[in-house]
Amino acid sequence: MSVQTTKRRLSPASIEALKGERPIVSLTAYTTPIARLLDPHVDFLLVGDSLGMVLYGLDTTVGVTLDMMIAHGQAVMRGSERSCIVIDLPFGSYQESKEQAFRSAARILKETGCSAVKLEGGAEMAETVDFLVSRGIPVLGHVGLMPQLVNTTGGYRSVGRNEKEVAKIRRDAKAIDDAGAFAIVVEGTVEPVAREITATLRCPTIGIGASPACDGQILVSDDMLGIFNDFKPRFVKHFAELAPAISKAVEDYANEVKARTFPGIEHTFQVKR
């Protein structure tokens, strides 16, 4: 009699336990094929609302809907088996009230099978984080630069450059930590401030444009693979340059189709005689 075993996914609790043990590795994923490629190498995959800009060509993440996040979350779940899957709560799906946040987050977990949700916000969202966590929904926090607030902050710029901003980041990070987040993304924050809050928080920090001292790092996959070239943030490193390779492959395909050299006989079905 054989016993079938399935790989056990990393959980939010296991991500939290990595603080002080080793750096946490994370990337974004939006589709099944990419999730399959990333899954063996990362601790958690974030189905980020950045998909609005990367996949849908939106100028900001504000236009992303809950239905979009759920559809892509389902795709990433199908393409992964070991990494913890976290899905962004999109703009407008949680800010109105903690009850609205619970309804949105519960729907995401029930319809995708993911392990946790992420939300942006500082001290003003601490009550919501506590409300979700106390009702069985793990939360990944997000402080510093908050892309969903781009319309009120005036653009994508690093934060922590004056005492007022530093005080806010400290206050926000502590509030979300105290509310029970299993980890906190720290985005676009000057290095000394990101380093400081990493040393003081209970939960791990996940840096993106923050500090190498953060407990982990995350990047948008299409950025680090050199696919999304609309703009390149200072904090992005291209670990590959796939855009030129893709362009060249499509050019070669087009040329072969026009020259009738593709498909070759080996790419066709023949009748056996």
UniProtKB/Swiss-Prot annotation:
Obligatory cofactor(s): Mg(2+)
Subcellular location: Cytoplasm
Taxonomic source organism: Sinorhizobium fredii (strain NBRC 101917 / NGR234)
Family that this chain belongs to: Belongs to the PanB family.
Pfam family, one: Pantoate_transf
Enzyme class of the recorded protein, top EC level: transferase
Cofactor binding description: Binds 1 Mg(2+) ion per subunit.
Pathway terms, separated by semicolons: Cofactor biosynthesis; (R)-pantothenate biosynthesis; (R)-pantoate from 3-methyl-2-oxobutanoate: step 1/2
Name of the protein in question: 3-methyl-2-oxobutanoate hydroxymethyltransferase
